[in-house]
């Protein structure tokens, strides 16, 4: 079991890796975890809509038109789960009596992304089965943004990272690692219907593992997350029925990736979506519902499985209030 611990630390990231991801740390944050964004090819850096916008680009938050809560669940092959819960709100303080000019608009978001995998086949040094193991990764977000001008907003997002492998230490306890990451974003809407955004993601993000509780002579190892740069653009035609989005993603260790998508909206009914996450197509839809006079949206996304794997399904509930 002890010899298996280091293998787990190295192996688990590959379960979340997309093609070309290389199994780098933090892969669960780069694979898409919400149905609307997933169906749009994971291109969302320049879209100021919904609570999830604060994770893709925190600078979009002052441009939200309502408060929103969201629940999202991903159904993945290989006994994996990927879930997200979040809340976001625009902040528009009222001007005090006697003050000139408009108050500075802002936005706030919080969220939690949880990734888990179970039924990992544990083996001893002779290759004999010992037990089934599991792993969970978590990212807790808080994002804040300001809009200093009509056409420009800036934002920052801090995230606490926590990785846990239970039942693997000498006393059958958990091996854990924690860290902190920082995202920085800029957003602009220079023309009607057109928006652009840039996000610098996973600055400082890393896992530091110490295996003293597993081995007689443990080691300390650090795995840094790839530092991501995303630039995106979005355009909604004047009659509002079509949204076109595109992102270009690059990092300090990975090859560039592109993300494109389109959303066709039928007013008050729903939307159809199609996207391309680099070389992986995605499809989905949204249904608009009224619950107690408030807008609720049910979103679904479908992504074909890689090679022999089953397809991926993502379902999200969004509530505006």
Task: Identify the residue ranges that each predicted region occupies.
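N-terminal periplasmic accessory domains that precede
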Residues: 52-63
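Intrinsically disordered, low-complexity, positively charged segments
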Residues: 37, 44-49
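Outer-membrane beta-barrel porins/channels
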Residues: 18-37, 74, 81-321
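Short strand-turn segments of transmembrane beta-barrel domains in outer membranes
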Residues: 42-45, 67-78
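Positively charged n-region of N-terminal signal peptides that target proteins for export
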Residues: 1-4, 150
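Sec-dependent N-terminal signal peptides
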Residues: 4-13
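A short, polar/charged loop/turn motif at coil->beta-strand junctions and beta-hairpin connectors
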Residues: 6, 34, 63-66
